[in-house]
Amino acid sequence: MNPEQFQMALAEKGIELSDDQMKQFHDYFKMLVEWNEKMNLTAITDEKEVYLKHFYDSISAAFYVDFTKFDTICDVGAGAGFPSLPIKICFPHLKVSIVDSLKKRMTFLDALAEKLGLTDVHFYHDRAETFGQNKAHREKYDLVTARAVARMSVLSELCMPLVKKGGSFLVMKAAQAEQELQTAEKAIKLFGGKVEEHFAFALPVEESERNIYVITKTKETPNKYPRKPGTPNKLPIE
């Protein structure tokens, strides 16, 4: 998917990108490739692959969820900024917080946000377990996203505490998502969530499976969650 195809594909979904926004994506791609030479940000560096598997894939959530209804977003373990920064480029009104445990990725994201002229974007170098117990952030976000490889039961413990009551947790998964959901149902309920919607689709060009789950926060997360750093991964609630 080249940049022109990317722009057309989004337009077909009702997301019209201006020349300025297209330049932001171009600069994002250039910086990603440049910085990737000195630090491991992504295994995907081919332009067409980046536009499809990073940019388009990140924005695909907006085909099913109305981002104009949200004000604040937190992206847990965003790595090189996915999915939150491509979403931010498309929906500039969003106030985005990104938390990641690797300092070098924070350095990249800071430089990237400055280059792209992104405002209302904040980066926090922290473990998700610690961040979720921080009163300044706990249950403060309209929407929390995760595009991480961790199991859904683990992601729920890391992300649900950050979602405000009535807000949503958006889980983006590839294949085997249904199986993961079954093992995560206990955790989702415990942390105050309810699975509201599931969208399954294929990524264009390569036709690979994608799944998006919208989990609504119906009640507050018990204070003891998330547990200490490392515990959710070692002893997931399933």
UniProtKB/Swiss-Prot annotation:
Coiled-coil ranges per UniProt: none
Subcellular location: Cytoplasm
Annotated Gene3D superfamilies: Vaccinia Virus protein VP39
UniProt enzyme class: transferase
GO cellular component, one term: cytosol
Molecular function via GO: rRNA (guanine-N7-)-methyltransferase activity
Chief localisation class: cytoplasm
Keywords carried by this UniProt record: Cytoplasm, Methyltransferase, rRNA processing, S-adenosyl-L-methionine, Transferase
Record flagged with keyword Methyltransferase: yes
EC number: 2.1.1.-
InterPro entries: rRNA_ssu_MeTfrase_G, SAM-dependent_MTases_sf
Binding site for S-adenosyl-L-methionine: 77, 82, 128-129, 147
Function field: Specifically methylates the N7 position of guanine in position 535 of 16S rRNA.
Membership in a protein family: Belongs to the methyltransferase superfamily. RNA methyltransferase RsmG family.
PANTHER family xref list: S-ADENOSYL-L-METHIONINE-DEPENDENT METHYLTRANSFERASES SUPERFAMILY PROTEIN (PTHR31760:SF0)
Annotated protein name in UniProt: Ribosomal RNA small subunit methyltransferase G
Native organism: Listeria innocua serovar 6a (strain ATCC BAA-680 / CLIP 11262)
